[in-house]
């Protein structure tokens, strides 16, 4: 097992790596950022320099991988574990840890909705304090991945093991429109019947229950997140933010404000087909 502390010394050549689209940064810029960031690579051989390609959805990315248009896909550890436990046709090529440059899960709002954002912040802080956040992580992330592993279901990553989430209804209460991509099971998932399931939905249901809000869910592609907010078609969007050391952030366009983060990833898998 090789540990490489970056800026890493890469072997000659490049590897085409797919990932779900980031906002406010190009694939070329992201490739440069990764090459010059501080991270740890664990693999059997010297890594080649990754060249990143963005896709508007997870399904498009996997199709590109299966078609040979890219060599690998990059996914967070929890998503990768779920995907691997459900699919024998893929394997881990390398593991990348970015302790100083974590990716954060939060909620995105139009900057005009500062009050709504602050109410979410308060609820998230309370959930961290009273243990609810840890409980939901155990049920919807660790618990789901364990169930998938034990069943050893070999199928598409859209699996029935993800626990459905129920949203309470409040008569006469305001309704918020929340956009979800469904691109990161068991974190973010849209079932075939259109219902939101997984960890993000569970977090949202808990917050909405505490705030007395009704929720209408909208299924979108990752690249449409900012436009959904700016157009007013959505009040809230599940957000995946890369916070770099020193406070520099990308994937946060002008006019978008983010809530207190409620989860973070600092370990990622590069997955490739077994054949």
Briefly describe each language-model feature range.
Residues 13-76, 116, 120, 163-245:
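Extracytoplasmic small-molecule ligand-binding "clamshell" domains
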